[in-house]
A protein has these predicted regions:
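Short hydrophobic/aromatic patches at helix-to-coil boundaries
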Residues: 124-128
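Short glycine/serine- and small hydrophobic-enriched flexible loop segments
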Residues: 41-45, 96-97
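Short linear capping/connector segments at secondary-structure termini
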Residues: 56-60, 73-76
C-alpha cells in the first residue's frame, strides 16, 4: 500500500511535470486525514475555482484517510531520527501507527526531509 504525501497529491492535481505516471494511481493509497486539510486549504488559499476544489474532493475519495487520533498526535511530539517540521511529524507518526497495526506502506513523497526521515525509520520509498 502507498502512503501518499501531500507533495505528490498536489503535483498530480496541479498537473506538474514531476507527477507520477498514470499507473501509479492504480495502487491502494492511504494517508493521514491531514492530507485533506493540506489540499483543501491550499486550493482555497489560491482562490481556486469551485470546480477544482470539487476535483480535489473526488481525488480524496480514492484514498483511505487515517483520522488524527491522540496516539498519533502524541507520537508526532516525540523525537524523530532527523529534524522534521510539524506536518512531516504528523505524517510520519501516522505511518508509524499504520506499521504498528500491521500495515506496511511505501512512502510517496517529493519532500526530501520527509523521504530521508521515513527512510531512516525503515520505510521504503515509492517510485514517483
Amino acid at each position: 500500500m502507498i502512503y501518499l504525501d501531500t507533495s505528490v497529491a498536489l503535483a498530480s492535481l496541479f498537473d506538474e511535470p514531476r507527477k507520477p505516471a498514470t499507473e501509479f494511481w492504480a495502487q491502494a493509497m492511504v494517508s493521514s486525514r491531514l492530507l485533506e486539510y493540506e489540499l483543501l486549504v491550499r486550493f482555497n488559499a489560491l482562490g481556486t475555482a469551485p470546480e477544482a476544489v470539487g476535483k480535489a474532493r473526488v481525488f480524496l475519495e480514492g484514498i483511505v484517510l487515517v483520522d488524527l487520533d491522540q496516539p498519533a498526535l502524541a507520537r508526532a511530539l516525540q523525537q524523530f531520527p532527523l529534524v522534521v517540521r510539524t506536518l512531516e511529524a504528523i505524517h510520519l507518526a501516522t505511518m508509524e501507527f499504520l506499521r504498528v497495526q500491521g500495515l506496511e506502506v511505501e512512502v510517496a513523497t517529493y519532500d526530501r526531509r520527509l523521504a530521508e526521515t521515513a527512510g531512516a525509520m525503515g520505510f521504503k520509498l515509492a517510485d514517483v
